[in-house]
Amino acid sequence: MLEKKIEIGGVYSRVQCYFQGHRKFEGYIGKDYISFENLLRENTIPTLTVLIRKELLLKYIEEIKPERQNWEMGDYPMWLWIAYKSKFYFMNEITGVYRILNESVSHSDSVDRHIEFYNSCRDIQHYFIDYSHRFDLLNWVEEYYNSRMYQLCLEQNYIEIKSYRDYFKTIKPTSFKTKMFKISANYRICEYLMKICLQNIFIRKLYNNINK
Protein backbone atom coordinates (compact mmCIF):
# COMPACT_ATOMS: atom_id res chain seq x y z
CA MET A 1 0.00 0.00 0.00
CA LEU A 2 2.85 2.40 0.84
CA GLU A 3 4.43 1.65 -2.54
CA LYS A 4 1.19 2.08 -4.48
CA LYS A 5 -0.18 5.26 -2.90
CA ILE A 6 2.15 8.15 -2.07
CA GLU A 7 -0.54 9.91 0.00
CA ILE A 8 -0.52 7.03 2.53
CA GLY A 9 1.98 7.71 5.31
CA GLY A 10 1.40 4.61 7.41
CA VAL A 11 -0.49 1.31 7.57
CA TYR A 12 -1.66 -0.77 10.51
CA SER A 13 -3.90 -3.77 11.26
CA ARG A 14 -5.60 -5.55 14.17
CA VAL A 15 -4.11 -7.67 16.96
CA GLN A 16 -5.54 -10.36 19.20
CA CYS A 17 -5.22 -9.69 22.95
CA TYR A 18 -3.52 -12.18 25.24
CA PHE A 19 -4.06 -11.61 28.97
CA GLN A 20 -0.92 -12.76 30.76
CA GLY A 21 -2.55 -13.07 34.20
CA HIS A 22 -5.40 -15.29 32.96
CA ARG A 23 -3.34 -16.97 30.24
CA LYS A 24 -6.04 -16.65 27.63
CA PHE A 25 -6.85 -14.86 24.40
CA GLU A 26 -9.76 -12.44 24.53
CA GLY A 27 -10.78 -9.54 22.33
CA TYR A 28 -9.00 -7.50 19.70
CA ILE A 29 -7.38 -4.08 19.31
CA GLY A 30 -7.46 -2.07 16.11
CA LYS A 31 -10.24 0.00 14.55
CA ASP A 32 -10.74 1.92 11.35
CA TYR A 33 -9.98 5.22 13.12
CA ILE A 34 -7.66 6.66 10.51
CA SER A 35 -8.66 10.32 10.71
CA PHE A 36 -6.88 12.86 12.90
CA GLU A 37 -10.19 13.70 14.60
CA ASN A 38 -10.94 10.10 15.61
CA LEU A 39 -7.39 9.37 16.74
CA LEU A 40 -7.38 12.54 18.80
CA ARG A 41 -10.22 11.12 20.81
CA GLU A 42 -8.93 7.55 21.14
CA ASN A 43 -5.74 5.71 20.22
CA THR A 44 -6.84 2.55 18.39
CA ILE A 45 -3.58 1.77 16.55
CA PRO A 46 -1.62 -1.31 17.76
CA THR A 47 2.03 -0.26 17.60
CA LEU A 48 3.39 -3.69 16.70
CA THR A 49 1.44 -3.71 13.41
CA VAL A 50 2.47 -0.25 12.18
CA LEU A 51 4.60 0.42 9.12
CA ILE A 52 5.37 4.08 8.33
CA ARG A 53 7.48 5.97 5.83
CA LYS A 54 11.04 6.65 6.99
CA GLU A 55 10.96 10.27 5.84
CA LEU A 56 7.85 10.93 7.95
CA LEU A 57 9.49 9.42 11.03
CA LEU A 58 12.59 11.59 10.62
CA LYS A 59 10.50 14.71 10.02
CA TYR A 60 8.38 13.98 13.10
CA ILE A 61 11.48 13.65 15.31
CA GLU A 62 12.97 16.84 13.89
CA GLU A 63 9.81 18.92 14.19
CA ILE A 64 8.13 17.68 17.38
CA LYS A 65 11.27 16.64 19.30
CA PRO A 66 9.42 13.99 21.35
CA GLU A 67 12.46 13.32 23.56
CA ARG A 68 11.95 16.78 25.10
CA GLN A 69 8.30 16.16 25.90
CA ASN A 70 7.20 14.63 29.18
CA TRP A 71 4.90 12.08 27.54
CA GLU A 72 4.21 8.63 28.95
CA MET A 73 3.63 7.21 25.45
CA GLY A 74 5.98 7.44 22.51
CA ASP A 75 3.70 6.03 19.83
CA TYR A 76 0.42 7.95 20.28
CA PRO A 77 1.88 11.43 19.52
CA MET A 78 3.48 10.03 16.38
CA TRP A 79 0.19 8.57 15.12
CA LEU A 80 -1.54 11.92 15.66
CA TRP A 81 1.19 13.79 13.80
CA ILE A 82 1.14 11.35 10.86
CA ALA A 83 -2.68 11.43 10.69
CA TYR A 84 -2.53 15.23 10.60
CA LYS A 85 0.28 15.50 8.06
CA SER A 86 -0.53 12.45 5.96
CA LYS A 87 -2.96 9.48 5.99
CA PHE A 88 -3.21 6.07 7.62
CA TYR A 89 -4.49 2.94 5.91
CA PHE A 90 -6.25 0.28 8.02
CA MET A 91 -5.93 -3.42 7.12
CA ASN A 92 -8.90 -5.23 8.67
CA GLU A 93 -7.07 -8.46 9.51
CA ILE A 94 -5.19 -9.88 12.51
CA THR A 95 -1.42 -9.81 12.06
CA GLY A 96 -0.13 -10.04 15.64
CA VAL A 97 -0.72 -10.77 19.31
CA TYR A 98 -0.74 -8.05 21.99
CA ARG A 99 0.26 -9.33 25.43
CA ILE A 100 -1.48 -7.48 28.28
CA LEU A 101 0.44 -7.58 31.56
CA ASN A 102 -1.07 -7.13 35.01
CA GLU A 103 0.94 -3.92 35.47
CA SER A 104 2.05 -1.62 32.64
CA VAL A 105 1.75 2.02 31.56
CA SER A 106 -1.65 1.51 29.94
CA HIS A 107 -2.95 -1.39 32.10
CA SER A 108 -2.85 -1.29 35.88
CA ASP A 109 -4.89 -2.06 38.98
CA SER A 110 -3.75 1.19 40.59
CA VAL A 111 -6.25 4.06 40.48
CA ASP A 112 -3.43 6.61 40.59
CA ARG A 113 -1.70 4.86 37.67
CA HIS A 114 -4.91 5.00 35.63
CA ILE A 115 -5.29 8.70 36.34
CA GLU A 116 -1.64 9.31 35.41
CA PHE A 117 -2.18 7.53 32.10
CA TYR A 118 -5.41 9.41 31.30
CA ASN A 119 -3.77 12.73 32.20
CA SER A 120 -0.81 11.97 29.94
CA CYS A 121 -3.18 11.13 27.05
CA ARG A 122 -5.00 14.38 27.70
CA ASP A 123 -1.73 16.37 27.64
CA ILE A 124 -0.85 14.84 24.28
CA GLN A 125 -4.30 15.61 22.90
CA HIS A 126 -4.13 19.22 24.08
CA TYR A 127 -0.68 19.58 22.52
CA PHE A 128 -1.96 18.48 19.12
CA ILE A 129 -5.10 20.58 19.38
CA ASP A 130 -2.79 23.59 19.78
CA TYR A 131 -0.46 22.29 17.07
CA SER A 132 -3.27 21.82 14.54
CA HIS A 133 -5.33 24.84 15.69
CA ARG A 134 -8.33 22.49 15.85
CA PHE A 135 -9.81 24.12 18.94
CA ASP A 136 -13.23 22.95 17.80
CA LEU A 137 -12.19 19.46 18.97
CA LEU A 138 -11.42 20.50 22.55
CA ASN A 139 -14.90 19.82 23.95
CA TRP A 140 -14.93 16.45 22.22
CA VAL A 141 -11.63 15.47 23.87
CA GLU A 142 -12.75 16.74 27.28
CA GLU A 143 -16.01 14.79 27.09
CA TYR A 144 -14.14 11.56 26.37
CA TYR A 145 -11.65 12.23 29.19
CA ASN A 146 -14.48 12.90 31.66
CA SER A 147 -16.27 9.73 30.57
CA ARG A 148 -13.15 7.65 31.25
CA MET A 149 -12.78 9.25 34.69
CA TYR A 150 -16.40 8.46 35.55
CA GLN A 151 -15.92 4.88 34.39
CA LEU A 152 -12.89 4.63 36.65
CA CYS A 153 -15.03 5.88 39.52
CA LEU A 154 -17.58 3.13 38.86
CA GLU A 155 -15.09 0.30 38.38
CA GLN A 156 -12.58 0.90 41.19
CA ASN A 157 -12.63 0.91 44.97
CA TYR A 158 -14.54 4.05 45.97
CA ILE A 159 -12.58 4.52 49.20
CA GLU A 160 -9.39 4.87 47.13
CA ILE A 161 -10.81 7.53 44.84
CA LYS A 162 -12.76 9.69 47.29
CA SER A 163 -9.92 12.24 47.08
CA TYR A 164 -10.86 12.75 43.43
CA ARG A 165 -14.54 13.49 44.13
CA ASP A 166 -13.86 17.24 44.31
CA TYR A 167 -12.59 17.08 40.74
CA PHE A 168 -15.82 15.50 39.53
CA LYS A 169 -17.88 18.25 41.18
CA THR A 170 -16.17 20.90 39.03
CA ILE A 171 -17.06 19.17 35.75
CA LYS A 172 -20.05 20.42 33.80
CA PRO A 173 -20.96 17.58 31.43
CA THR A 174 -22.53 18.65 28.15
CA SER A 175 -23.34 15.34 26.47
CA PHE A 176 -26.10 12.98 27.64
CA LYS A 177 -23.59 10.10 27.91
CA THR A 178 -21.29 12.02 30.25
CA LYS A 179 -24.21 13.25 32.36
CA MET A 180 -25.35 9.66 32.83
CA PHE A 181 -21.82 8.59 33.80
CA LYS A 182 -21.74 11.31 36.46
CA ILE A 183 -25.19 10.47 37.84
CA SER A 184 -24.32 6.77 37.91
CA ALA A 185 -20.94 7.40 39.56
CA ASN A 186 -22.49 9.51 42.32
CA TYR A 187 -25.23 6.93 42.88
CA ARG A 188 -22.76 4.03 43.11
CA ILE A 189 -20.55 5.91 45.58
CA CYS A 190 -23.56 6.73 47.80
CA GLU A 191 -24.68 3.10 47.56
CA TYR A 192 -21.23 1.90 48.60
CA LEU A 193 -21.06 4.27 51.58
CA MET A 194 -24.56 3.21 52.66
CA LYS A 195 -23.45 -0.42 52.57
CA ILE A 196 -20.46 0.41 54.80
CA CYS A 197 -22.77 2.18 57.27
CA LEU A 198 -25.14 -0.82 57.43
CA GLN A 199 -22.22 -3.19 57.94
CA ASN A 200 -20.96 -1.04 60.82
CA ILE A 201 -24.43 -1.02 62.43
CA PHE A 202 -24.67 -4.81 62.11
CA ILE A 203 -21.18 -5.33 63.59
CA ARG A 204 -21.98 -2.98 66.48
CA LYS A 205 -25.22 -4.83 67.28
CA LEU A 206 -23.46 -8.18 67.07
CA TYR A 207 -20.72 -6.95 69.39
CA ASN A 208 -23.29 -5.64 71.90
CA ASN A 209 -25.19 -8.97 71.87
CA ILE A 210 -21.98 -10.93 72.49
CA ASN A 211 -21.04 -8.72 75.44
CA LYS A 212 -24.44 -8.88 77.15
Question: What are these model-predicted stretches?
Answer:
Residues 1:
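Acidic donor-binding/catalytic loop of UDP-sugar-dependent glycosyltransferases
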Residues 4-5, 37, 75, 138:
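Intrinsically disordered, low-complexity segments enriched in polar/charged residues with Gly/Pro
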Residues 5-15:
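A short, conserved acidic/glycine-rich loop-to-beta-strand motif
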Residues 13-14, 19-111:
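Conserved nucleotide-sugar donor-binding catalytic segment
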Residues 44, 61-62, 71-72, 76-77, ...:
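C-terminal subregions of glycosyltransferases and related glycan-biosynthesis enzymes
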